Regions:
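Short glycine-rich or small-residue beta-strand-to-loop segments that form or flank ligand, phosphate
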Residues: 92-99
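N-terminal, polar/charged subdomain of small-to-medium soluble alpha/beta proteins
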Residues: 1-92, 106-110, 114-150
Length: 150
């Protein structure tokens, strides 16, 4: 399991390739990459600034990752999230789950993203054509996370 919160850019393809490197037991890798959009809620987005609570954010991500590992037979799990200034088209988040079989990898990847969106302390400020604004959480994110409650 690897949790990274960083201000530097990352290569999603390299992250996917690292998920199965030197582990021939991996039969499936499922990944999600989130990108900065150039448009949101009807406004043009020129950029975004992501803030986090150092220490608390990593702890929250680690707790989510541990829960995923307890639910599914994963061989590897990676969570990487950018902070700082980002421009449209840049990757913000990478979640990768590797398992012997595809369903565990699919489910774990979805679970981690759903919980990351609702439980990890990140704050997004968009620079839009109307000025800067904080991005609010969406009801659909909470509904997606609710499906994993046991």
């Amino acid at each position: 399991m690897a949790i990274r919160v960083q201000s530097t850019a990352f290569d999603p393809g390299a992250e996917v390739n690292a998920m199965h490197a030197a582990n021939v037991g991996v039969g499936a890798v499922v990944s999600f990459v989130g990108y900065v959009r150039d448009f949101n809620d009807g406004l043009e987005v020129a950029g975004m600034f992501l803030e986090h609570y150092p220490g608390m954010t990593e702890k929250a991500l680690g707790k989510i990752a541990v829960e995923a590992q307890q639910r599914w037979p994963l061989l590897k799990l990676e969570v990487l999230h950018r902070i700082g200034a980002l421009e449209p088209g840049e990757p913000i988040v990478f979640v990768g789950a590797a398992s012997a079989h595809r369903q565990a990898a699919f489910d774990a990847c979805s679970f981690v993203m759903d919980y990351l969106k609702t439980r990890a302390p990140f704050w997004k400020k968009e620079n839009t054509s109307d000025g800067a604004r904080w991005v609010e959480g969406r009801d659909s994110d909470h509904a997606a996370a609710d499906r994993w409650k046991q």
